[in-house]
């Protein structure tokens, strides 16, 4: 019976294929599905939380586009205030009664530098903004919080009314209720908003009062540049917020991903959720800029110093900021995934009554909250059910241990094997005697030594070549066919690696093949771990944890590789046995020719004993010379008798028998029975070498490979596969944003290599069936990926829309920004562009082009009142915005801006201004950056109410006069006909195209000024 785990093609093929399928299939399913929401009958799975109610709220607030600069945004705000009141009334509290206080914040204004404008070039002009907030905050008093309105400041001196006794800090749960002007905001961020409503409902219930106070904030203006979170900085509760949970949506459904956390301690609050999902690799990718997306997390952590988590939907990105970010294209399951995680995490953060989030900051920043000393963490989920969270310092210590200790252990094992004469690696032959006249015995220990690096380089090079080919020929194919790309690169690497390793082993079979691969994996992993350890220490990155686990496993498998050599005989003993077998063979071999012939430099003996030749046939011609033996004075070789069938097998004491000695001229002699038995021991059951491998390899354990594969394979496959899929999902559709088109392919390649590394030591034993099948897969997917159209109705290409109007001349242009090839295809389908001259140039978005045409046929209707039919278009546009510039003393001026039916106007200056003041606004907030030495080149102005006037005092240096433009933005496209160009684009663009906003305004109206 064949050993089911023997190192033979059948068992190796079966077990490796089974393990890969058993792990990869569930990982793909988990990646593509969402844990089911509780049934309607079990809607109260979490006491006090109602999923049906939350879903109904979602459908209400996503009936229209609701950017900050829209009328429906105001309706959404009113609806949310009403829902908060209903929830509190249902919980037995209302307004400021009891343990809950509602803040309808219409007072917080913020003036400061735009974070994205901060550049390292000294003296460069930058961008500033003035914003008026409309946030809604609900404070749920904790059991340990002070009584009364402890947050109020006295009118005199700005000091607290009293010293707050509880220093444990508050927990913030945050979401934004505005959407982009081209998306309904179901996922971004409607689900976060309705989750916040349920969080209020849960903690407002008397039975669920939190230990530490919880602040639920529904902020407004996030989409235009995180303005709502900036306005929080002016609220009296903000200094007491120590931790936060930010709820976001950078996709349109799926699972809510733990995208970022500030430290290990806050991550622990999330760890116990029923369906965790996320990895620290995504967090580090954000920090390094590989994933472009800004959320309120940036303000809460970077500016205010709060510690917290970013829980966000992240796919599919093709629906993000489009009209398919609606309730139809998401699910209750996705909502429940975020809602259940938010309730759990907020409860854990609030329930920490120790000193975890209290105390001095390690950076000593005085303008940030004192919330203790965080520690960097490493975290990831397992199959969407388990969650691992440990300290980065611990991983750093373990990395150092692996780097230092494991080479020493392997060196020690190698030394012991060498002393025992059992180290077969890197040994070509062995000498059994010290005399130079005796030729060495071949061991074959170098066979297979350099196969792995050659196969790895060739397979990797071919896989990378295919990735670059895709980038060159059809770069967006991964946009909608990522699994086709994954299958292509996976199958190519597998087949190429197998072909080289199997071919090399066929040409020169080696029992050390698996061992050499483990040694190479150790060397490669050790070098990689050095780099990972440096990033852990210097840059505080935990993304290298798969390498740490992989190298730990490789160290163990390499150690086992050395340990199995202990089962082998000593090299010299084995060599002597081979020599003896050859002695018997040559002793009985019939000989002819000159018996004095002797080779000057005898070749090494072959390693395989001539067992069938121990008893020679009766008739056989041979060119072997006759042998002689003597004491140096006996040279009578010619008298030596040729043995025949009558010659005794065992020599006697007579003189004649003394002539029958071996070719090795040794005085060592054994009985023929001992020689035969010694030779036969290599042919006993279980000791036979596999096929044509080295004869001594028959004693190697045939089952050890199985346990080595279990050590190296499953955990590495799990980490690499689920992390790779998550990262590919995060970036494979970012090419439309102008991101690097090669990056998704490189991620696929890198994690393909990681997934397949565990099989490399045994891949040469796999039968041809799997590799040939994968070759067919590669050919099919390669052809498909080269010729298929990259977009589909389910994965639409996003193009960026803006309409620009000169309010003085009434000239207007419709512009689409994107990749040149596809922008032209989209514009070609638009009736208003037919026959028009389309001009293209560089876009403000990197790596994209801007293609524009005359929009006279699709002129927007932006005013709050409908003009008379015979009113000239020039007069209509001139009345949309006015700017009055009044010169003051020196280089000072006052600008008065009024705009109809909008809340946003921006001032652009030809020469930077050195100072400004918005009358009725707030002072400059240094937390967002010092006033730049190079001045301000653009000032963005936002009002709470549409149609209000801005009065801005400015001053400048050097120039005699100040020139610039006022750019007002209109973003409300809910009423058909308001922006006909957008309506036309949504109606007539190809089914594979989606339209999203280019900037804050769908329409930008410009008017110049000079003073």
Curated annotation (Swiss-Prot):
Transmembrane feature ranges: 10-30, 396-416, 450-470, 484-504, 515-535, 547-567, 700-720, 743-763, 770-790
Compositional bias (Polar residues): 589-600
Keywords: Glycoprotein, Hydrolase, Membrane, Metal-binding, Metalloprotease, Protease, Transmembrane, Transmembrane helix, Vacuole, Zinc
Cofactor note as given: Binds 2 Zn(2+) ions per subunit.
UniProt-annotated stretches for the region Disordered: 587-657
Segments on the Cytoplasmic face: 1-9, 417-449, 505-514, 568-699, 764-769
Residues annotated to bind Zn(2+) 2: 188, 223, 321
Cross-referenced Gene3D superfamilies: Zn peptidases
Membrane-topology descriptor: Multi-pass membrane protein
Subcellular location: Vacuole membrane
Vacuolar side: 31-395, 471-483, 536-546, 721-742, 791-1011
Major localization class: membrane
SUPFAM superfamilies xrefs: Zn-dependent exopeptidases
Stored InterPro entries: Fxna-like_M28_dom, M28_fam, Peptidase_M28, PFF1_C, PFF1_TM
Any one GO BP annotation for this protein: proteolysis
GO cellular component entries: vacuolar membrane
Residues involved in Zn(2+) 1 binding: 176, 188, 248
Annotated disulfide bonds: none
Family that this chain belongs to: Belongs to the peptidase M28 family.
Protein name: Vacuolar membrane protease
């Amino acid at each position: 019976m064949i050993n089911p785990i023997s190192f033979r093609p059948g068992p190796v093929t079966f077990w490796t294929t089974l393990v890969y399928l058993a792990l990869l299939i569930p990982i793909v399913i988990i990646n593509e599905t969402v844990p089911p929401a509780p049934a309607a009958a079990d809607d109260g799975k979490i006491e006090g939380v109602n999923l049906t109610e939350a879903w109904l709220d979602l459908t209400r607030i996503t009936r229209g586009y609701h950017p900050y600069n829209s009328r429906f945004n105001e309706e959404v705000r009113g609806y949310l205030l009403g829902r908060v009141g209903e929830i509190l009334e249902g919980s037995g509290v209302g307004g400021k009664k009891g343990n809950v206080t509602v803040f309808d914040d219409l007072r917080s204004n913020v003036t400061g530098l735009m974070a994205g404008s901060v550049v390292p070039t000294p003296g460069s002009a930058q961008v500033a903004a003035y914003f008026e907030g409309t946030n809604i905050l609900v404070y749920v008093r904790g059991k340990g919080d002070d009584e009364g309105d402890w947050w109020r400041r006295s009118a005199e001196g700005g000091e607290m009314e009293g010293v707050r006794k509880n220093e444990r800090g508050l927990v913030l749960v945050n979401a934004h209720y505005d959407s982009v002007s081209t998306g309904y905001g179901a996922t971004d961020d409607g689900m976060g908003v309705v989750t916040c409503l349920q969080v209020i409902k849960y903690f407002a219930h008397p039975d669920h009062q939190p230990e530490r106070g919880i602040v639920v904030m529904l902020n407004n203006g996030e989409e235009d540049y995180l303005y709502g979170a900036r306005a929080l900085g002016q609220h009296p509760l903000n200094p007491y917020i120590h931790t936060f949970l930010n709820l976001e949506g950078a996709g349109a459904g799926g699972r809510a991903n733990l995208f970022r956390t500030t430290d290990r301690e806050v991550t622990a609050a999330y760890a116990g959720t029923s369906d965790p999902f996320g990895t620290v690799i995504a967090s580090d990718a954000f920090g390094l800029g590989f994933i472009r997306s800004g959320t309120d997390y940036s303000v809460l952590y970077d500016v205010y110093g709060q510690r917290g988590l970013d829980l966000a939907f992240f796919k599919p990105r093709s629906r993000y900021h489009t009209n398919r970010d609606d309730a139809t294209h998401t699910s209750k399951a996705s909502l429940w995934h975020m809602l259940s995680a938010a309730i759990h995490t907020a409860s854990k953060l609030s329930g920490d009554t120790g000193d975890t989030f209290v105390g001095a900051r390690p950076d000593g920043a005085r303008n940030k909250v004192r919330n203790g000393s965080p520690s960097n963490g490493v975290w990831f989920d397992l199959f969407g059910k388990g969650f691992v969270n440990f300290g980065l310092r611990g991983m750093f210590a373990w990395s150092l241990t692996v780097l230092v200790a494991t080479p020493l252990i392997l060196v020690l094992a190698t030394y012991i094997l060498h002393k025992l004469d059992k180290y077969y690696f890197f040994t070509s032959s062995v000498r059994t005697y010290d005399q130079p006249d005796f030729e060495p015995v071949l061991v074959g220990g170098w066979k297979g030594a350099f196969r792995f690096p050659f196969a790895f380089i060739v397979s990797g090079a071919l896989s990378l070549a295919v990735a670059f080919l895709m980038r060159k020929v059809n770069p967006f194919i991964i946009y909608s066919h990522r699994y086709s790309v994954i299958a292509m690169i996976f199958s190519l690497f597998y087949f190429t690696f197998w072909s080289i390793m199997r071919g090399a082993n066929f040409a020169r079979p080696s029992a050390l093949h698996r061992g050499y691969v483990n040694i190479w994996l150790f060397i490669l992993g050790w070098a990689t771990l050095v780099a990972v350890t440096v990033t852990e220490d210097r840059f505080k990155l935990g993304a290298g944890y798969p390498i740490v686990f992989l190298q730990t496993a490789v160290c163990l498998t390499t150690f086992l590789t050395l340990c199995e050599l202990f089962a082998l005989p000593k090299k010299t003993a084995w060599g002597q046995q081979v020599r003896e077998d050859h002695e018997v063979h040559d002793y009985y071999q019939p000989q002819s020719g000159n018996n004095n012939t002797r080779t000057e430099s005898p070749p090494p003996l072959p390693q395989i004993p001539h067992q069938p030749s121990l008893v020679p046939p009766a008739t056989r011609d041979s060119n072997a010379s006759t042998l002689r033996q003597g004491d140096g004075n006996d040279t009578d070789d010619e008298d030596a008798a040729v043995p025949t069938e009558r010659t005794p097998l065992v020599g006697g004491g007579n003189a004649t028998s003394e002539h029958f000695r071996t070719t090795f001229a040794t005085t060592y002699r054994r009985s023929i029975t001992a020689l035969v038995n010694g030779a036969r021991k290599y042919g006993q059951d279980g000791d036979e070498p596999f096929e044509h491998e080295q004869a001594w390899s028959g004693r190697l354990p045939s089952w050890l490979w199985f346990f080595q594969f279990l050590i190296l394979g499953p955990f590495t496959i799990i980490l690499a596969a689920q992390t790779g899929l998550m990262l590919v999902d995060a970036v494979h559709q970012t090419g439309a944003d102008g991101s690097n088109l090669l990056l998704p392919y490189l991620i696929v390649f890198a994690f393909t290599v990681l997934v397949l590394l565990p099989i490399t030591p045994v891949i040469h034993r796999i039968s041809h069936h799997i590799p040939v099948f994968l070759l067919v897969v590669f050919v099919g997917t390669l052809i498909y990926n080269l010729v298929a159209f990259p977009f589909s109705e389910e994965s639409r290409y996003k193009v960026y829309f803006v309409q620009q109007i000169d309010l003085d001349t009434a000239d207007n242009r419709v512009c689409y920004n994107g990749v040149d090839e596809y922008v032209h295809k989209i514009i070609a389908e638009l009736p208003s562009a037919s026959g028009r001259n389309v001009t293209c140039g560089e876009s403000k978005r990197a790596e994209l082009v801007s293609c524009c045409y005359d929009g006279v046929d699709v002129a927007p209707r932006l005013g709050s009142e409908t003009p008379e039919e015979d009113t000239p278009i020039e007069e209509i546009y001139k009345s949309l915005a006015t700017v009055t510039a009044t010169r003051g003393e020196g280089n000072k001026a006052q600008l008065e801006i009024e705009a109809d039916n909008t809340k946003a106007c921006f001032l652009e200056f030809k020469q930077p201004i050195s100072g400004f003041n918005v009358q009725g606004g707030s002072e400059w907030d240094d937390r967002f950056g010092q006033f730049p030495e190079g001045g301000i080149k653009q000032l963005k102005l936002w009002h709470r109410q549409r149609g209000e006037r801005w009065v801005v005092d400015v001053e400048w240096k050097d120039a005699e006069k100040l020139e610039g433009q006022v750019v007002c933005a209109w973003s409300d496209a809910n009423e058909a006909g308001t922006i006909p160009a957008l309506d036309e684009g949504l109606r007539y663009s190809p089914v594979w195209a989606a339209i999203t906003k280019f900037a804050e305004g769908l329409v930008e109206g410009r008017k110049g000024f000079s003073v």
